[in-house]
Structure formats: C-alpha cells, structure tokens
C-alpha cells in the first residue's frame, strides 16, 4: 500500500512540474531538432549535420539530466516581483522555445541555399514536424538530399588588358581553383 502511495505522490509531483502546463493551447514546445542527410553523396564530400545546424533558425532549450530544468526554472519566477531570487531564476532559466512554422520553413530554405553555395545545386531540403506527443511537444526533422556536387571542368582566361595578363598568368600556379575540384 505504501508503494502505491509513494508512486502516486511521485506522479503528482512530476505532473506539477510540467513545463508544458503554461503553453497556450495549439502551441508546442520545441523538444528536438535533427538533421538527416541521404547517404548518396560520398562521405568525404558530404556536408555534415554539424555544418548544417548553424542554419537552423530555431533550436530547443538546453536540457539538464534529460529534463527541461531551465524552462521550469524560468517559469517558477514570478514576473510581478522584482527581487534577487526571481531575477536569478529569470537569468539562469530559459524562456520556452515554441514551434514557429515560419521559422521552420525558413530554416529549410537556409539549408537549401547553403548546400547550393557549397556546389550541391541539385540539393533538396524538407522538414517534418511530429506533434503527436500528448504533452504538447514538437520534434522537427530536416531531411537533406545533397546529390552530386558540381565540379570545375576547365579554367580559361580572356584578358582585354595585356598588362593584367602578365601579372595574373604567372600566379595561376598558386590559385585554389583547379579542374576537378568541387565548385565551392
């Protein structure tokens, strides 16, 4: 009997600490963002997920021991009181990051633009949002297809000024642009 009571009390306390309690109806706490790349591009030429993460506009809150401790701490602060304890909670805590579909779409566009600038002109970036969780949490998965990178076929120079030709042509051995390299 005491075990059942202990489990019930623990369950009650955990539900009282829910960070999604104050989230408005129809909104979702951004829980996780992942980037998945297809494996069709060779590994040494593939853009890593770590490079792509910089272009995602929304990132989830920090976690502590698998919990949203920082969001919980932020929500425990009383906005009506201005004392050092509430100020400390607001300073250490983090405001909850809510899913914003316009930022999610913009992030997919940013990923596509970045892959284009790296020479992957036939790339694609899509996203999928999972809001099926009963606790008003959202997970976003970005899927990228990089394809084959474009390569530099040949290099030719067309000089109108002979003076510039005498300066540039002897220095072409030091150029970083070479035939066969990825157009980046």
Residue ranges of each PLM-predicted region?
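Sec-dependent signal peptide recognition
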Residues: 2-7
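C-terminal motif of bacterial Sec signal peptides marking the signal peptidase cleavage site
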Residues: 13-16
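Interaction-mediating elements
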Residues: 18-184
């Amino acid at each position: 009997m005491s075990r059942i009571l202990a489990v019930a009390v623990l369950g009650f306390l955990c539900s009282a600490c829910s960070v999604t309690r104050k989230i408005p109806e129809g909104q979702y706490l951004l829980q996780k963002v992942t980037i998945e790349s297809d494996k069709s591009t060779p590994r040494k030429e593939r853009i890593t997920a770590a490079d792509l993460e910089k272009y995602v506009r929304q990132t989830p809150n920090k976690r502590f021991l698998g919990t949203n401790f920082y969001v919980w701490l932020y929500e425990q602060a009383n906005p009506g009181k201005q004392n050092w304890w509430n100020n400390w909670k607001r300073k250490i805590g983090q405001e909850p990051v809510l899913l914003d579909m316009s930022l999610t779409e913009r992030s997919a566009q940013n990923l596509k633009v970045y892959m284009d600038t790296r020479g992957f002109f036939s790339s694609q970036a899509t996203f999928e949002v999972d809001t099926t969780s009963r606790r008003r949490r959202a997970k976003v998965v970005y899927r990228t297809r990089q394809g084959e990178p474009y390569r530099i076929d040949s290099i030719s120079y067309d000089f109108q000024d002979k003076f510039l030709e005498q300066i540039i042509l002897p220095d072409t051995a030091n150029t970083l642009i070479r035939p066969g390299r990825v157009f980046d």
